[in-house]
Amino acid sequence: MAKKLSKRREALLKKVDATKEYSVDEAMATLKELKSAKFDETVEVALNLNVDPRHADQMVRGSVVLPHGTGKTVRVAVFAKDAKADEAKAAGADLVGAADLIEDIQAGKIDFDIVISTPDMMGVLGKVARVLGPKGLMPNPKTGTVTMDVAKAVENAKGGQVNFRVDKKGNIHAGIGKISFDADKIKENFVTLLEKINRAKPASAKGRYITNAAVSLTMSPSITLDTSEVMEIK
């Protein structure tokens, strides 16, 4: 099996010029040639930003709703009470609650991909911040997941919202769809994400903002992008 996989990998590597910086259009076309898995692979974006997230004013994070969605089925948990809980349920939230959800999380039951909360419930959520935080699940106003408009937040989450956050090394990783999508739709999702990230450039960030950019499939080698073109997407 290992030999078969290595041959497949070798064949894929021959389709990508590792010395080249691809235009966005070239990269989208090449991605289609790299499909090799039996499942519908995710199209992934990897960026390296010239920021130092140890400084609060250089933390790059946010969210964006991709025009063509992510192709993933997303399970949404909402912390809300009374009328807001009813709104969340009506909007299609998978889990809605308060103290009961806290107990489930403390017991290790994390059966959701995104957490949304009304502002008044954030104190309750503090009890599980150490569990949700490292998993990137803690609600945050910057990603639109702390809000009174829970119905809209649920719709966004279900409709293709991507949350991004730079890690301590300046990297951002995000999925922007499935390889079964038309190339034009993958590109539109990519452009929508990059517009948001480029507009989120901290005023204190100096020099070249995006130092490296690449796209890939779940099982494929990476395609390096022309960062000059990528930074012009605004």
Curated annotation (Swiss-Prot):
Name of one Pfam family that matches: Ribosomal_L1
Transmembrane segments: none
GO terms for biological process, alphabetical: regulation of translation; translation
Entry keyword annotation includes Translocase: no
Annotated InterPro entries: Ribosom_uL1_bac-type (IPR005878), Ribosomal_uL1 (IPR002143), Ribosomal_uL1-like (IPR023674), Ribosomal_uL1/biogenesis (IPR028364), Ribosomal_uL1_3-a/b-sand (IPR016095), Ribosomal_uL1_CS (IPR023673)
Gene3D superfamilies: 3.30.190.20, 3.40.50.790
Keywords recorded for this protein, A-Z: Repressor, Ribonucleoprotein, Ribosomal protein, RNA-binding, rRNA-binding, Translation regulation, tRNA-binding
GO cellular component: cytosolic large ribosomal subunit
A single MF term (Gene Ontology): tRNA binding
Domain of life: Bacteria
CDD domains hit by this protein: Ribosomal_L1
Disulfide bonds: none
Family matches, as NCBIfam families: rplA_bact (TIGR01169)
Subunit relationships: Part of the 50S ribosomal subunit.
Family: Belongs to the universal ribosomal protein uL1 family.
Known role: Binds directly to 23S rRNA. The L1 stalk is quite mobile in the ribosome, and is involved in E site tRNA release.
The protein, known as: Large ribosomal subunit protein uL1
Source species: Sulfurovum sp. (strain NBC37-1)
